[in-house]
Swiss-Prot record:
Gene source species: Rhizobium meliloti (strain 1021)
Protein name: Peptide methionine sulfoxide reductase MsrB 1
Cellular compartments per GO CC: cytoplasm
Catalytic reaction(s) noted: L-methionyl-[protein] + [thioredoxin]-disulfide + H2O = L-methionyl-(R)-S-oxide-[protein] + [thioredoxin]-dithiol
Binding site for Zn(2+): 52, 55, 101, 104
InterPro entries cross-referenced by the UniProt entry: Met_Sox_Rdtase_MsrB, Met_Sox_Rdtase_MsrB_dom, Mss4-like_sf
Biological process, per Gene Ontology: protein repair; response to oxidative stress
Key words, A-Z: Metal-binding, Oxidoreductase, Zinc
Amino acid sequence: MSENRMPKITKTNEEWRAALTPEQYRVTREHGTERPFTGPFLDNKRHGTYKCVCCGRALFRSDTKFDSGCGWPSYFAPVDPDAIAEYVDRSHLMVRTEIRCADCDAHLGHVFPDGPPPTGLRYCLNGTAMTFEED
């Protein structure tokens, strides 16, 4: 877990608010969650790279995306393990592993140990926290 890691990109709340939509700010800066089956990219089948909406860091490739049925875009591996920082999340009377962008500390979603091979992991992302760059 990355409890004491410092983000590489820091901005004030006002700077983040100016750069993001209200929903992007709520999800990424206030650790919000979009409603299931409502976010962008859930049904995206194009080939490309999913990037952090806050800083543009490459996070996931389309070839690691799978339909988990949970209502959020899901991936079995990041493009680079160093792209994601993991934190213990004890909110909502649960213990989960939160994932954030390693460069700007944006809340992305959570990772669960119930994914497909080869990793057995399910990175469950808020689509609002990402952009998509087609190949």
